[in-house]
Amino acid sequence: HRKALLGNLVCSLVEHGRIKTTVSKAKEARPLAEKMITLAKRGDLAARRKAVARLRSKEAVHTLFAELGPRYEDRPGGYTRIVRLGQRQGDAAEMAYLELVE
């Protein structure tokens, strides 16, 4: 369940560029997102297969390898940022944006 949750969060991040989630989930999803972008920078078949195995969405993997890999080619890591938003109405969970840097 945890792997599926993180994979879905990263898929949404790749598709939309920014997702709104709890701080805890953002902190957990961030390392996976960074690893997936690093795989996309490699760009070989083995990297693509590893990405498909983790994300389970061919559309997200295509976007990752076609757009994000080339975009971050010269950047040595640090592809995402967490922006805190305050507490959610209802259960007071600390919310944040997990977004891709330019």
Question: Where is each model-derived feature located?
Answer:
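Structured, basic alpha/beta domains of bacterial-type, RNA-associated proteins
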Residues: H1-E102
